[in-house]
Amino acid sequence: MKKRLYYLAFGLVAIAASSCSKLDNYPAPSNTITGSTVDAGTGNTVQTEIGSRGTRVKLLETSYSSNPTPYYFQSMQDGTFNDTKIFAATYNVSVEGPFVPLVQTDSTGKVTSDQSQNITIKGTNTVTKLNFKVEPFLRIDWVGQPVFNADSTVTVQFKITRGTTNANYQQDVTNINLYVSNTKYDGDNNYDPRYTNMISYNGTDGTSLIGQTITMTTTGGALPQQDVYFRIGARINAGLDEYNYSTPVSVKYP
């Protein structure tokens, strides 16, 4: 009897080991989804920040479920995205960020507008390219180049305009920030607090600056003697309160 139990236990262990081996040998995902989030009005990519508060790509695998759990991956700062570890399957794909949502619903949850894209990925090592045209809440454009002042602070000029005429996304501007960093990856999650100039607005105070040339100067005295990057971020009280951004610019210490 003991021998039989021994052989039975040994057999179960062998089966389990075999099953684990098969699972371990399952091929890793090797397909790529790449592309851009593009401003429908200008054709430029929509600037964002790196990390969880930036633009993200949303995938719904619809191959086996009508109500799948979303899978997200983050966009890069310049508005492009790339994920090289995607399984072969059928997906519904959209992007989420500081722009009019591609998928909109009414108060009952009924979809009223859907600009997401459906794709089918087959095989391995394939590349699927997707571009999404969106209407950013705000556009931020530099006016001229940053200027070094006599006291080694820097003054910049820029304009903020609306990126959409959608009546649901005309909220007041709540924040306008001049970010300073020693890398080009500056934003609300990566800046030097000694020199960054951050302004919060109440009511229509920030909104009244839309369309005007805005001037801001770094804080904290003389900048360090090194290459410095500047970037403007602004946001309205909508969506996930994410920032719209200018492109980063650098200036060499004189």
Residue spans of the language-model regions?
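Bacterial Sec-dependent N-terminal signal peptides
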Residues: 1-44, 254
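Short beta-strand elements
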Residues: 111-119, 240-254
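Structured interaction patches on ligand/partner-binding surfaces of diverse proteins
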Residues: 98-131
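Short, acidic Ser/Thr/Gly-rich low-complexity loop/linker segments typical of extracellular
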Residues: 62-80
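Short, ordered, surface-exposed loop/turn motifs in non-cytosolic proteins
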Residues: 42-66, 170-173
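Short amphipathic, basic-aromatic surface patches that mediate peripheral association
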Residues: 37-46, 159-168
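Short Pro-Gly-centered beta-turn/loop motif in secreted/extracellular proteins
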Residues: 82-99
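Beta-strand-rich modules
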Residues: 217-241
